[in-house]
Amino acid sequence: MTELKNDRYLRALQRQPVDVTPVWMMRQAGRYLPEYKATRAQAGDFMSLCKNAELACEVTLQPLRRYPLDAAILFSDILTIPDAMGLGLYFEAGEGPRFTSPITGKADVEKLPVPDPEQELGYVMNAVRTIRRELKGEVPLIGFSGSPWTLATYMVEGGSSKAFTVIKKMMYAESQTLHLLLDKLAKSVTLYLNAQIRAGAQSVMIFDTWGGVLTGRDYQQFSLYYMHKIVDGLLRENEGRRVPVTLFTKGGGQWLEAIAETGCDALGLDWTTDIADARRRVGHKVALQGNMDPSMLYASPARIEEEVASILAGFGNGEGHVFNLGHGIHQDVPPEHAGAFVEAVHRLSAPYHL
């Protein structure tokens, strides 16, 4: 087993004792850090940054040099899989991700390959191996993927969406086509995450960013069903250690019980879910990650500390909490506010672990 100097994060995900509540931030390697902006400028563009193992490693490590975070997360993008399937990912200034060849019907879905993660996505595995080497066992490395439903929304809509009418039209008018796409994506995500684990990811997370736009019944059928399939197919042990799995559906607070049934180790919570309520409902079964509103980082350090105290009190004593934001950190947050957040979590959580 490779030695880890700090395994708090992995222990908390398995609801084992820790000295303080571990903390990391979604998008902790990102545009709020001036050093990230400098490295991105050096890379030329976002995907060039993702595809250069040394630079992806550099931006992964940048937040760890600033803050005593309890985990590193691979610097990559959820849309690497659709890009590897040949949809032609590009980023439009102010518009976010776009695809040159979105999915328009069954013929497009049938043509899609299931990418070989060590070939078409080999650059991600190179980044994982490079980051693990450079971390030198300081903290665990988190690998990740988008969920099949969330990836499908981008692939069918052709990019970001506000109303999701194009994919919902497919869901209601051509459900077999959508199921075919989701099934291919579930296979691709399983292979991709297992390759990340073999390359050295010590925990993995599935981001279901758009699951919350569905009705309860549609969520079960078009999102959760496929995440469950992935969880069933994942390597759960590597390097002599359990590899915990976290599922995060943004806007999914009403479905926590169903998500906990998948066999995952932890649930991500967004800031609209009360953490005390979540723990009462599923805390006997899974760990919880979250869930401060990312916009709270615009507040004063004193106000941030109050919010941290309130969330810690909501979760209460004992194990099974990984502190995080309820979604990614905003790009214009002052870096010192992120530092105040991390420091407050460690300092204020110790009494809950006596």
From Swiss-Prot:
E.C. designation(s): 4.1.1.37
Quaternary structure annotation from Swiss-Prot or TrEMBL: Homodimer.
Pathway participation: Porphyrin-containing compound metabolism; protoporphyrin-IX biosynthesis; coproporphyrinogen-III from 5-aminolevulinate: step 4/4
Protein family according to the UniProt entry: Belongs to the uroporphyrinogen decarboxylase family.
Gene Ontology cellular component list: cytosol
Subcellular location: Cytoplasm
Gene name of the record: hemE
Annotated site residue numbers, Transition state stabilizer: 77
Domain of life: Bacteria
Gene Ontology MF terms: uroporphyrinogen decarboxylase activity
Protein name, UniProt field: Uroporphyrinogen decarboxylase
BP GO annotations: protoporphyrinogen IX biosynthetic process from glutamate
PROSITE patterns listed in its UniProt record: UROD_1, UROD_2
Job of this protein: Catalyzes the decarboxylation of four acetate groups of uroporphyrinogen-III to yield coproporphyrinogen-III.
InterPro entries xref list: UROD/MetE-like_sf, Uroporphyrinogen_deCO2ase_HemE, Uroporphyrinogen_deCOase
Catalytic activity, reaction form: uroporphyrinogen III + 4 H(+) = coproporphyrinogen III + 4 CO2
